[in-house]
Amino acid sequence: MKNKFLIIDTSILPDVFDKVVKVKELLRTGHVKDISEGVKQVGISRSTYYKYRDSVFTLSESVAGHKITLGLTLAHKAGTLSKILDNIAQKKGNILTINQDIPINNAANVSITFDASQLEVEVNELMEDIRTLKSVIKVNLAAVE
């Protein structure tokens, strides 16, 4: 059976999945010395950890070497797209394609696809950085390939 992957907001999932990810992060960063210490710290059993550890990943874990497509709505202001592209490039995202509609009612829809294999931050953090830029109306994760 072929695996099927979904991107799901953790707020709708049982806490156990978030706790498995937390244990993996504690192990990766060296904040705990072994799995027993990690599961004890977050409050799950070892069997729960082993059951889900190979199936639950953060978005940043799952996109290494993958393409990300962001859908954006931008105000029609000079330099807005350039600032977004600079932001992605500064975090080592490699732009692959840009599609931009003509502005209607002073707003344009843009999709940007980039290689995330060298991305230095999590995709969520990159999206938040872009959201804070002036003239950015909306940012959403359109696709992960």
UniProtKB/Swiss-Prot annotation:
Record family assignment: Belongs to the UPF0735 family.
SUPFAM superfamilies given in the database record: ACT-like
Classification via InterPro entries: ACT-like_dom_sf, ACT_dom, UPF0735_ACT_dom-cont
Transmembrane segments: none
Domain of life: Bacteria
Protein name: UPF0735 ACT domain-containing protein CKL_0858
Provenance organism: Clostridium kluyveri (strain ATCC 8527 / DSM 555 / NBRC 12016 / NCIMB 10680 / K1)
Residues annotated as domain ACT: 69-144
